C-alpha cells in the first residue's frame, strides 16, 4: 500500500496544451515530448533500463554482451564507480559557484597506479603476441607485489616488466630478458634485479628454462626448415647430456646449436642473424660453439642430411 500511495503522490507530467496527449520519451536526449505539438515537457529524464553493450574483443567472457564496463576484480573498488552529473539550477552550486556534488573520489591512487600498470602489461604483451592467460597472471603478480610494498624504490614499469617475464616462465612460454626489454622502457639489468626481488618477496619460483623452450621460436623467426630445427634441438640436448656446456645459459647453447645445424645444412645463418633473434652477442655464440664443436660428430641425429660435412664446419 505504501508503495502505491507513493507512486500516486508523484506529479504527473503532461503537455500544458494537450493534457490528454501521449508523451514520447527520447531516451538518448532524456526528453519527454508531446506527440501532438512536439513540445518538450520534461528533460533530463533518467533511463532506468539496462545499457547493454557488445564487446567483440572481450575474450575473457563467454558472452561478449554486458551492461556497462567490465568489472576488474583486481581493483579495490571492483572498477565500478558512480559519476554525479553537474546540475543546471542555482541549487546545484554553492556561494562560490562550485558544484555541491563534486566527485571527490572516483578512483583511489593505488587503483589508478595498478590500472596504469595493467595497461602497460597489456601493451607489452600485445607487442609480442602473448595470450590472455599470460596477461591475467602478470596482473595478479603485479597486484601481489604492489600490495606488499616490498619493492619500494623500483618503478612500476620495471616491476610490471619483471612480472611479465615471470608469468611467461610460469605458463611454460618463456621469453628472454632481451625480448621483454625490447617491448618495455626498462633496461635488461633493471628487469633482472626486479625479477630476483619479486621471487624473494613472493616466496615463489619458476621452472628452469631449457634449450627446447626457445628452439622452435628462434628457428621459426630465422626461417629455418623443420629438419634444421630438429637437428638443432638434438644437438643442444646432446650437448647438455654430455656435459659439454657447463655454466652456459640455455639461450646461448640453443643459439650455438642452431648455428652448427644451419652451417651443416643448405640453410646457413650467420652468428649475427642468430644473435639478433636469440638476443645474445656474437661472442657468446662463439664461446658456446667452441665447447660443442670438438664433439660435433656425436651431436647430429643419425638421419641428418649434410650439405656441409662435419669436418668442414667452421672452427671459429
Swiss-Prot record:
Compartments, record wording: Nucleus; Chromosome
E.C. numbers: 2.3.1.48
Catalytic activity line of the entry: L-lysyl-[protein] + acetyl-CoA = N(6)-acetyl-L-lysyl-[protein] + CoA + H(+)
Primary localization class, coarse: nucleus
UniProt similarity note: Belongs to the TFIIB family.
Function: General transcription factor that plays a role in transcription initiation by RNA polymerase II (Pol II). Involved in the pre-initiation complex (PIC) formation and Pol II recruitment at promoter DNA. Together with the TATA box-bound TBP forms the core initiation complex and provides a bridge between TBP and the Pol II-TFIIF complex. Released from the PIC early following the onset of transcription during the initiation and elongation transition and reassociates with TBP during the next transcription cycle. Associates with chromatin to core promoter-specific regions.
Name of protein: Transcription initiation factor IIB
Organism: Xenopus laevis (African clawed frog)
Amino acid at each position: 500500500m505504501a508503495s502505491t500511495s507513493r507512486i500516486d503522490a508523484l506529479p504527473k507530467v503532461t503537455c500544458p496544451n494537450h493534457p490528454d496527449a501521449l508523451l514520447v520519451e527520447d531516451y538518448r536526449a532524456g526528453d519527454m515530448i508531446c506527440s501532438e505539438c512536439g513540445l518538450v515537457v520534461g528533460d533530463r529524464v533518467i533511463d532506468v533500463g539496462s545499457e547493454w553493450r557488445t564487446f567483440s574483443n572481450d575474450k575473457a567472457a563467454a558472452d561478449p554482451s554486458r551492461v556497462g564496463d567490465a568489472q576488474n576484480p583486481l581493483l579495490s573498488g571492483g572498477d565500478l564507480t558512480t559519476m554525479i552529473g553537474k546540475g543546471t539550477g542555482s541549487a546545484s552550486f554553492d556561494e562560490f559557484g562550485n558544484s555541491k556534488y563534486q566527485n571527490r573520489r572516483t578512483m583511489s591512487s593505488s587503483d589508478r597506479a595498478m590500472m596504469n600498470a595493467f595497461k602497460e602489461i597489456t601493451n607489452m604483451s600485445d607487442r609480442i603476441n602473448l595470450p590472455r592467460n599470460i596477461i591475467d597472471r602478470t596482473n595478479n603478480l603485479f597486484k601481489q607485489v604492489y600490495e606488499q610494498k616490498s619493492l619500494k624504490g623500483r618503478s612500476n614499469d620495471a616491476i610490471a616488466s619483471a612480472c611479465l617475464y615471470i608469468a611467461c616462465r610460469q605458463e611454460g612460454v618463456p621469453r628472454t630478458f632481451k625480448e621483454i626489454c625490447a617491448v618495455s622502457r626498462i633496461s635488461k639489468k633493471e628487469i633482472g634485479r626486479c625479477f630476483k626481488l619479486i621471487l624473494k618477496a613472493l616466496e615463489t619460483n619458476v621452472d628452469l628454462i631449457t634449450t627446447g623452450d626457445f628452439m622452435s621460436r628462434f628457428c621459426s623467426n630465422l626461417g629455418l626448415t623443420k629438419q634444421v630445427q630438429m637437428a638443432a634441438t638434438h644437438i643442444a640436448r646432446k650437448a647438455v647430456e654430455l656435459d659439454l656446456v657447463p655454466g652456459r645459459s640455455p639461450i646461448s647453447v640453443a643459439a650455438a646449436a642452431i648455428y652448427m645445424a644451419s652451417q651443416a645444412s643448405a640453410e646457413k645463418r650467420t652468428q649475427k642473424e642468430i644473435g639478433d633473434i636469440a638476443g645474445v652477442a656474437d661472442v657468446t655464440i662463439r664461446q658456446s660453439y667452441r665447447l660443442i664443436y670438438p664433439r660435433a660428430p656425436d651431436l647430429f641425429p643419425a638421419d641428418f642430411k649434410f650439405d656441409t660435412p662435419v669436418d668442414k664446419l667452421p672452427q671459429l
